[in-house]
Structures are given as C-alpha cells and as structure tokens.
Amino acid sequence: MLALQVSALGAGCGDEAAGSGGEPVTMPCYPPDRAVAEGDPDALYAASDIPRFDFRLRDEVWAALQANARDEEYVEAEACYRGSSLGLVGLRFKGGYGTLEMCFEEREELPCPKLSMKVKFDEYVDGQRFYRQKRLNFHAMMRDPTKLHERITYDLYRDMGVVAPRSAWATLHVNGEPMGLFAMVEEIDGRFTENRFPEDPDGKLYKAAWPITKEPGYYDARIETNEEGASHARFIAFAGDLASAEGADRLAALSTWTDVAELQRYMAVDDAILNFDGITTFYVDDAGSAENHNFFFYEEPTSGTFRLVPWDLDNTLSWGSFQYFGEVPRWTETPAMCPADFEVYQGKEQVRAPGCDVLFSALSQDLDGYRRAVRELLDGPFREGRLEEQVDRHAGLIRAAVAEDPFGPAPETWRSDVAILKGDLSLMRGRMEALLGGAARDD
C-alpha cells in the first residue's frame, strides 16, 4: 500500500493515530483514483455495501468546528474514500432548526450525539469532484430510528415520476474516531439539474421558495444557482397569477406554471409517507407569517415550468409521530376562514392550514386527478409487500453498520423499530384507501 503524506494538515487518512509532537504523519491511504472523481453517480448510490469515509483535520480545528457548528462554515480536511485519497476538501456541519439549532443548549455545548455533515470537494481545489459531484450530504438520521426513511421515500417519489435526489448510506470516521452510520444524500445543485433536466439544465434552482409574494428579495434569499444578476420575473408572475385568480381559474393559472399531473403524483407520495414536515406544513412565526420548507423549485429556462423536488425526508413513514403531530386539516380542505392556524407538537408550534395557501387551493380544484395518482401509487410502488421487501433488503445491508454505530441505537431497539415500520406500512395504505373512499380528514 502506498502512503499519503499531508504536511499542510499535519495528518492524513486512515485508522492510525496521529503522531506526537505535531509532526507530519504518514497514514495508509492510496493515491487518488481518477475513476472515483469521474465515476457514474448511479454506481455510488447503488453500491451493495456501506462505504467508509475518513476525514483528517487538526485536533484544534475539529474542536472549533464542533463548538461553532451552527456557523456552517467549511474547514480544511483531508478525505479518504475506501482507502483512497480524495484530496483536500471542505467539511462542515449542516442542518435546520430542528436538526442543528435545537441541538445546542448553550453556545459551546453539543448535546446531540451526532450531527449531519456536508463535504464540498472543490472548496480548496478548483474542479475537484467525487463521482462528478461538487458536494455530498451526510445526514445523521437522528429522527429516524430505522435509518431507512430517506432511501425508501426518495425512491418512492422517483418511482412515481417525481424528480428526487439519490440516497444510500456511509460510515464516517474523523481523526480515526468512528462517527457512525449516515445517510449519504445527493446534493440538489447545478450537477443535479444537469442530470435530471438534460434538455433544460441551466435554469434557476430555489430552496424553500414558494409562490407567495411579489417581493424580489424573498427569491434573492432562496436562489441556489445562477444567482448573479438573477431576475425572478417568472416566479413573481407565478405568484401573482395564483393570487389574482379563484376556483377553476386558479387551477388554470397553476397549469400555466407547473405540470399539474406531476404535482398530483408528488402529493400522492407526500400523503402516503406521512410527510408532516414538508410542503404542506406552514409554520407560523411570531410576526404571523407562515412558511413551509424541505423542498426545492426548479425553473426550466426554456419552458418556464416550475418543477418541485422533495428534500429532507427523515420525518416520514412514522405512524406514531404523525399522530403526535396534531390535528390539521388536509391540503384538500379550505377552511371557512383563512388564515386558520392550528397548534401542533402539543402546543409547541403553530401551523397554518395548507388549504389557505394559493397553490394548494388551486390543486384541490382537481381532486379526481389526485385520486388517480393515489390509485396508481397504491396499485404500483406502494402496493402490499413491495415496500416491506425493500425494508428487509435495506435493513440487511445496514444491519452491521447500525450495530457498530457508537451513538446507537442498540441492535435490539433498531430491530424492533424496523418491525414497527413494516407493520405501519399497512396502516398507511389503509389510510390512503380511506381517503380515496371519501374521508376528508384523518379521523
């Protein structure tokens, strides 16, 4: 085996402990593999085993990164993948309010046992790639006791013709210390849009931007690609057309700017997987404004069509958590008075009824199309036995990595949670069948 010496960091990749005295350390790590940089991403996410990533950085840098995790700023790290060097990369923690901010009781305390991380391969080396990707997400899955949710649900969206990121698993080590099992999730960025929209790849990508305002600043803060000199004229027109129309005219406006059939398929999956922390959940802030999250919108530059992409699906496929969330009217219902706000999480948060939103108000004008999408889902990707087989197969793949994760869960607890998930799938199917039969709410 050849060795990689990283004098700039004072450390390298692998399992060996760092030397004393701060001298450069030679670690067992193969030279970079060009095939890894230029490989097909499909091969990465379809691997039949759990790959290992090693990150090496100075002890004081690692300590500072943990203490300042909420800053979400990259630091230099030397990365190895399956024992081969990936070179110098940017490494940071990542997350939203529920997965990062709430993990800090005080500025320098880190009570959560494991945090999600992100790698940027070209942060310090221009043009550096990993399976043609600039960035890669490692999600801690601390809200998913089975460690299966993201892989199963992203696949389910794609099975229904909805564009969604790819997901698998990986184990991480930092300075030789095991960090445990993570969901390895594709970044939604320019590489993603080139892959998914090859006929229209260079459009604007927005994170958590919804057609609710004509203020350009709102979209400025949420654009992810082609930011420089960006005009948001189409998004603003989209929002304006929805706001100025009612009833069937609002549905016609929605049809102008989106693929309504695709949105109906999106909602069929979203409802089936019990996604109570996605696009239908409009959290109300102290000022009375309400916003949803965990999605992207991609504006196709030629057609002007807006395509919805799901994101952050750990809070799905959980019957118990869904029941705990709270009683909120479904997106198919328009309350008698809007806005209508409801307490969730036992009064800890308030959300606005999604039926008060202009996009959902428009989409609910064609519930027959939505029901057809649900029927397609129930007879196809969500049919009895299919997801149960996926649960068994994926659980078999990650079983050993779960058992070795220093942050848990205990193997017997994990096996129990996997069994609960398999049992809950029939409850989810029954709920969707009941909704097709005319039930407006979850009783």
Label the predicted regions:
Residues 10-12:
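C-terminal motif of bacterial Sec signal peptides marking the signal peptidase cleavage site
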Residues 14-16, 21-443:
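Phosphate/dinucleotide-binding and metal-coordinating scaffold of catalytic cores
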